[in-house]
């Protein structure tokens, strides 16, 4: 008698790749035009937060297996390296689809209903620019902590999941000299000039809202928002007064946040958990997100410092970290583009009773005509 074995790899699907398919289904909700616009924004945000957690825990665990030379295959017949290769391919496709949805559907739809997201600070009107610069001076500048790297200062520790702006800066006297060079000598000086460039970074403060509402257009009624990182980029020269800013671009890292705790070996489980939670902020960098138009010199420096492979580098064609869309859902004036709030039906039979249990004992409440 021929007995079929159901343990063959072809009968199983890898758990991690299956999860990526799940997150893609979440994103598909954001692409469904039958769902109200602001509800679709929430699904884009959820896709982002899901992917962050997936990388910090599941992908991190697989990388730990690779570092430990653990080669055992899972039920689908894939070892850790094969799973990581498959995950990289699928998640890059997912992120591309996510930003296609954001750029081609969400942003134009928001503008159509009266809300414009200003994606580049160069597109600000004169009045908007004045408002933004004033907001920077009064609210943002006091909470910024710029950090630089040079021969005396190592590369700063970048915290997990934080949004940062990296910059290449050059001392002003060096910059003036380089501009005064003869054109014939300029090409020969390029390598020397690049050596003079220094790396600087500033964290986008989480204590401030991710997006700022700008004054409403009185004629059209159109409302405008700009992201916090765009305001900082516009004014980043004010943080480095002795330098010329050559370029500035946002970036973001995901670190290994998988907890590895041996409950049997830990003498104090609570202290061990607290210790592991602190380490999560400084674990190995497993994913780097950068603006797709980032300067190649800056990108090369980040790749080197974070020791990132091409598989774990995500070039983003839009704002990094789309979880801010969840906060945008709370904006007033767009209720018609949201699912109406559920209002539970009142039960008159229970409204005027001092003791509802006495009333319940009289019979099934749902059978009474006074329920609605």
Model-derived features: positions:
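N-terminal localization/anchoring segments of enzymes in phospholipid and broader phosphate metabolism
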Residues: 1-372
């Amino acid at each position: 008698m021929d007995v079929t074995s159901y343990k063959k790899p072809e009968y199983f699907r890898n758990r991690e790749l299956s999860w990526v398919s799940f997150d893609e289904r979440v994103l598909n909700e954001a692409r469904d035009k039958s769902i109200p616009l602001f509800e679709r924004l929430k699904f884009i945000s959820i896709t982002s937060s899901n992917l962050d957690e997936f990388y910090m825990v599941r992908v991190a665990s697989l990388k730990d297996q690779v570092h430990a030379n653990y080669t055992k295959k899972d039920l689908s017949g894939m070892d850790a390296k094969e799973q990581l290769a498959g995950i990289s391919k699928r998640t890059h496709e997912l992120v591309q689809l996510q930003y296609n949805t954001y750029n081609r559907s969400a942003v134009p739809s928001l503008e159509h209903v009266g809300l414009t997201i200003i994606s580049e600070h160069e597109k600000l009107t004169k009045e908007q620019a004045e408002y933004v610069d004033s907001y920077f001076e009064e609210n943002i500048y006091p909470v910024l902590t710029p950090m630089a790297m040079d021969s005396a200062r190592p590369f700063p520790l970048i915290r997990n999941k934080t949004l940062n702006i990296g910059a290449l800066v050059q001392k002003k006297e060096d910059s003036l000299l380089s501009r005064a060079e003869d054109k014939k000598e300029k090409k020969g000086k390029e390598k020397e000039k690049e050596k003079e460039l220094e790396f600087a970074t500033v964290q986008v403060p989480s204590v401030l809202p991710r997006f700022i509402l700008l004054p409403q257009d009185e004629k059209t009624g159109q409302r405008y928002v700009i992201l916090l990182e765009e305001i900082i980029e516009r004014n980043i020269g004010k943080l480095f007064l002795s330098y010329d800013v050559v370029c500035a671009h946002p970036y973001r890292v995901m670190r290994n946040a998988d907890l590895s705790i041996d409950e049997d070996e830990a003498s104090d489980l609570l202290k061990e958990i607290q210790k592991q939670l602190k380490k999560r902020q400084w674990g190995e960098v497993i994913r780097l997100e950068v603006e797709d138009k980032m300067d190649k010199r800056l990108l090369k420096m980040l790749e080197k410092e974070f020791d990132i492979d091409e598989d774990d580098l995500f070039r983003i064609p839009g704002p990094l970290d789309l979880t801010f869309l969840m906060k945008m859902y709370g904006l007033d004036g767009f209720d018609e583009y949201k699912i109406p709030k559920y209002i539970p039906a009142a039960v008159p039979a229970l409204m005027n009773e001092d003791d509802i249990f006495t009333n319940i004992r009289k019979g099934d409440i749902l059978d009474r005509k006074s329920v609605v």
